[in-house]
């Protein structure tokens, strides 16, 4: 059986780095141990306690290989030119402009391309080849020359963002919709499925706060996005990121924020839900800043609410030691039970910061 390499450094390698970055890969690779039975290619040494912990939940002993033939698990890296095109924020920006979804989007390829911007409007400047949620900064009309030093760059109006959500589109056409939790710097902190058995926009917590006609327009836009990207030649799954924003007191949808042609944290959250959700419908994948507790202590702390196979209810500690974030999977019958579980988790770990609300 060929091993898998969790190449979470996918964008970095795709857009320039010639060598893999193990530290990035090791920050996420352990997630594969819970949802993929194949051996994991890794130079990291996992403790016997952690490997047994994974086995207790999956029923299979994880196999770690230091050297082996492998295939990439996060992003393909088999058709570099196509993958660069599909993952570039330039392609999504061009589609936003063409379809009139965000006319204040600007693709700046040199200092000669600086557009005339609205006075007082703040803009988000993105590296078109950066990792999702990274390599961005704020700019205004008056500081373009001093702020933007490298090109190309995508310039978009900074909107009053309220909630983030995505659709993951599988190769067979199936779409799953979920809410993403991000912090004030747009860094990913978790994914919530209110009903992973019916992962549609209608299940989003904020769905009914937005006009139905706006959702209809969004659905047409989503169909167009999928059509355009499929026509461009993609062969595997991809995510379409969107968000809700407030405009003069009215909630609206930014149809297309970006597209990620690779595995995503949202897809991982869905796969965890399928594996551990059972008859329960609400699930959440949660990241918190690494606590001062080691793995053993953290596992012991949350033992009163640890997930059990009999009921598929509770919390699973996913992360080992030596990682930047503690990661948890939460499974509950419904929102009421989920809120209670999260409350209990917070009380058991009072020093941890939980940005997720159910």
Predicted feature locations:
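Nucleotide-activated donor-dependent transferases that construct or modify glycoconjugates
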Residues: 1-20
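Conserved N-proximal alpha/beta basic substrate-recognition cap immediately N-terminal to
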Residues: 21-120, 130-131, 140
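Active-site nucleotide/adenylate-binding loops and adjacent lid/helix of ATP-dependent enzymes
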Residues: 84-161, 170-173, 196-221
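A long amphipathic alpha-helix within ATP-dependent nucleotide-binding catalytic cores
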Residues: 188-252, 288-311
């Amino acid at each position: 059986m060929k091993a898998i390499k969790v190449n979470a450094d996918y964008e970095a390698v795709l857009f320039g780095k010639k060598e893999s970055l193990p530290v990035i890969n090791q920050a996420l690779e352990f997630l594969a141990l819970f949802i993929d039975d194949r051996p994991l290619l890794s130079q990291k040494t996992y403790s016997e306690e952690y490997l047994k912990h994974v086995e207790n939940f999956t029923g299979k002993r994880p196999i770690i290989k230091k050297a082996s033939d492998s295939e990439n698990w996060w992003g393909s890296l088999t058709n570099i030119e196509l993958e660069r095109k599909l993952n570039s924020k330039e392609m999504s920006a061009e589609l936003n402009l063409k379809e009139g979804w965000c006319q204040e989007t600007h693709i700046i390829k040199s200092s000669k391309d600086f557009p005339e911007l609205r006075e007082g409007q703040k803009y988000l400047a993105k590296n078109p080849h950066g990792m999702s949620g990274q390599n961005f900064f704020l700019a205004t009309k008056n500081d373009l020359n001093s702020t933007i030093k490298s090109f190309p760059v995508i310039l978009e109006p900074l909107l009053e963002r309220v909630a983030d959500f995505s659709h993951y589109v599988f190769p067979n056409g199936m779409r799953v919709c979920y809410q993403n939790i991000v912090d004030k710097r747009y860094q990913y902190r978790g994914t919530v499925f209110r009903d992973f058995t019916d992962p549609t926009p209608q299940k989003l917590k904020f769905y009914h706060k937005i006009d139905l006609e706006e959702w209809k327009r969004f659905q047409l836009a989503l169909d167009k996005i999928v059509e355009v990207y499929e026509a461009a030649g993609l062969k595997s799954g991809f995510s379409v990121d969107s968000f809700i924003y407030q405009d003069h007191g009215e909630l609206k949808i930014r149809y297309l924020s970006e597209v990620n042609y690779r595995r995503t944290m949202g897809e991982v959250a869905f796969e965890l839900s399928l594996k551990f959700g059972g008859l329960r419908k609400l699930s959440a994948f949660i990241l918190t800043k690494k606590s001062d507790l080691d793995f053993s202590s953290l596992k012991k702390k949350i033992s009163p609410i640890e997930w059990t196979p009999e009921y598929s209810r509770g919390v699973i500690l996913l992360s080992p030691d030596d990682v930047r974030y503690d990661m948890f999977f939460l499974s509950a019958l419904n929102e009421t039970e989920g809120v209670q579980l999260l409350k209990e988790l917070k009380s058991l770990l009072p020093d941890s910061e939980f940005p997720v609300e159910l």
